[in-house]
């Protein structure tokens, strides 16, 4: 960890700013963010307002290749998930501007959603190492999910998120639930820390790296993003009443106290399903089952408030 404020750290001489202007508040935040970061003393050497989110990975990769000491990225959880592959296991830290709908990654790291305070955090915070999840060859920050969570990702249109913000998550969940069909799953644990598990009728499997995901849902009361483990919740299929019970459990972190769920903490898991199911990582459908998921320990350098202690 660095104990010198970032803006006065002599090792930070080149800073790139990359903003997804298609994120919920990205278009109106870009110019103000540039002004604030420079005002706080950060040496911004390149700035990229991107209207095409597909250009985010290549732009961040170029910023790293050009020798920047810090990459500041503005956007939501989908933006962060799309660029962590470029920064994983690299020496270049990430500065975060939460400009999305849910901003669960920022919530886990205690980064303020207020733009000025977020810029202040980048300038005066500290650099820490956190874990990433790994689904196949794809890194993710918050959660991978199979089942209802993947269906919610399909139902979460950019227009819906722009229009109603965080309310888009419960609306999309209800829409997805009506079309959801139960599925069979088998979970195996390569490290032998749990016995293989088979489930004939599931609603969802979640494999969480961060503490928060899905618009403020809590993986577990004691979960953290730097604990070198994944938190897995397996949700049995049920009716509307069971869905409400599960939603409440996720919201307050007490899902373990319901009969609808099983919980596992591990470093690696293999998930097989019938039928073959899409895998959603942080709102993007990137693969299908069978899928191997694991934790990438200390994979990302990121700036957090100086008061941040751990992932809780």
What does each model-found stretch correspond to?
Residues 1-71, 81, 309-312:
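ATP/NTP phosphate-donor binding region
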Residues 2-4, 191, 199, 224, ...:
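ATP/nucleoside-binding phosphotransfer catalytic cores, i.e., glycine-rich phosphate-binding loops
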Residues 18, 28, 39-40, 50, ...:
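Catalytic core of DAGKc-family lipid kinases
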Residues 73-77:
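N-terminal glycine-rich "phosphate-gripper" loop used for MgATP/nucleotide binding
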Residues 79-92:
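Short Gly/Thr/Asp-enriched flexible loops that form oxyanion-binding sites at enzyme active sites
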Residues 145, 149, 206-221, 285:
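Glycine-rich phosphate/pyrophosphate-binding beta-alpha loops
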Residues 158-168, 221-242:
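Gly/Ser/Thr-rich active-site loops/lids in small-molecule metabolic enzymes
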């Amino acid at each position: 960890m660095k104990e010198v404020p970032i803006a006065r750290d002599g090792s930070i001489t080149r800073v790139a700013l990359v903003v997804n202007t298609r994120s919920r508040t990205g278009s109106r935040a870009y110019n103000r963010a540039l002004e604030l970061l420079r005002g706080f003393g950060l040496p911004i050497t390149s700035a990229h307002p991107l209207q095409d989110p597909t250009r985010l990975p290549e732009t961040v990769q170029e910023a790293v290749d050009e020798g920047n000491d810090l990459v500041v990225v503005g956007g939501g959880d989908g933006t962060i998930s799309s660029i962590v592959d470029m920064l994983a296991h690299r020496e270049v830290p990430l500065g975060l501007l939460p400009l999305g709908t849910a901003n669960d990654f920022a919530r886990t790291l205690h980064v303020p959603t207020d733009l000025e305070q977020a810029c202040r955090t980048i300038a005066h915070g500290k650099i820490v190492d956190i874990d990433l999840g790994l689904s196949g060859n794809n890194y993710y920050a918050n959660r991978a999910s199979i089942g209802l969570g993947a269906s919610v990702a399909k139902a979460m249109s950019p227009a819906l998120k722009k229009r109603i913000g965080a309310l888009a998550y419960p609306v999309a969940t209800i829409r997805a639930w009506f079309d959801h069909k139960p599925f069979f799953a088998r979970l195996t644990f390569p490290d032998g820390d749990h016995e293989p598990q088979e489930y004939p009728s599931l609603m969802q499997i979640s494999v969480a790296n961060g503490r928060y995901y899905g618009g403020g849902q809590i993986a577990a009361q004691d979960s953290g993003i730097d604990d070198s483990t994944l938190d897995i919740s397996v949700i049995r299929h049920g009716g509307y009443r069971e869905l409400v019970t599960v939603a409440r459990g996720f919201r307050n972190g007490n899902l373990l106290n319901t009969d609808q769920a099983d919980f596992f903490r591990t470093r690696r898991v293999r998930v097989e399903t019938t039928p073959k199911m899409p895998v959603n990582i942080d709102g993007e459908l990137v693969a299908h089952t069978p899928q191997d998921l694991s934790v990438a320990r200390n994979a990302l350098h990121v700036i957090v408030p100086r008061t941040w202690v751990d992932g809780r």
